[in-house]
A protein has these predicted regions:
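N-terminal glycine-/serine-/threonine-rich phosphate-binding loop
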Residues: 4-50
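Short beta-strand segments
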Residues: 12-16, 53-54, 124-127, 152-153
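Short, active-site-adjacent cap segments at secondary-structure transitions
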Residues: 19-21, 56-61, 158-160
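Short, well-ordered secondary-structure micro-motifs
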Residues: 23, 62-63, 135-136, 161-164
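Ligand-binding beta-strand-loop-alpha-helix segment within the catalytic cores
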Residues: 63-133, 143-144
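Acidic, metal-binding active-site segment of PIN/NYN-like and related structure-specific nucleases
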Residues: 141-169
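Active-site rim beta-loop-alpha module in soluble metabolic enzymes
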Residues: 158-196
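Conserved small/polar residues in nucleotide/adenosyl-binding loops
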Residues: 199-201
Length: 201
């Protein structure tokens, strides 16, 4: 297994839910088309990719709706996690449709995803545990899978030390280790349902 990991590079990508559902439908179709092309290219270069999908606006809207009847933060988080898994299923089926070697299930844990990456070129998952953002899940998966890189793909250009939309003095961070990224994403520190972390946009 160790030799196989050295021969085939592993990378983890966190896709913010906002990237999957831009306001204009043409942009959405264009983006998904580009994703398909990229997936074919990556698979042809013997890369293994773990993809963690965020819930985006659908998750936040569902949580807002459920708040009228549910007071439990954990139950509200489960609503958001369900939205991430729905988005993950969309990406999984798109990749299966073009013939990529994709895990046939949406894993519930990062350890399960890491095991599936031994067998498949692509593993797609959503959220896992109430209180954790999908960015934090991606960093945890990078650790579990021994990935070379963890890419946070969102609608903000950099990772910042605080929300650049609220703070003019927010500093962009260009180079981070997995451990530093884990600290920023708040692995092990629960957040309120629907809350955005520093890089969960």
């Amino acid at each position: 297994v160790c030799e196989a990991r050295l021969m085939t590079s592993r990378h983890i990508v966190a896709l913010g839910g906002s990237l999957l559902r831009p306001e204009e439908s043409e942009k959405r179709s264009e983006w998904l088309g580009q994703l398909r092309q990229l997936a074919v290219h990556l698979e042809g270069n013997e890369r293994k990719i773990g993809i963690v999908i965020g819930g985006g606006l659908p998750a936040r809207e569902a949580i807002e709706l459920a708040k009228n009847c549910i007071s439990s933060s954990e139950k509200l988080d489960q609503v958001g996690i369900a939205a991430t898994r729905l988005n993950a299923t969309v990406i999984q089926q798109i990749l299966l449709d073009i013939g990529c070697n994709v895990a046939p299930e949406i894993p519930h844990t990062t350890s399960q995803s890491a095991e599936l990456l031994e067998q498949y070129n692509f593993v797609v998952m959503g959220g896992t545990t109430p209180g954790h953002t999908t960015d934090a899940v991606a960093v945890a998966l990078a650790r579990d899978a021994g990935a070379r890189t963890c890419i946070i793909a969102t609608n903000v250009s950099h990772v910042y030390d605080k929300d650049p939309r609220q703070f003019d003095d927010a500093q962009s961070l260009t180079n981070l280790t997995i451990d530093q990224l884990a600290e920023i994403t708040g692995i092990g520190e629960p957040l309120a349902p629907g809350t955005l972390s520093l890089i969960h946009i």
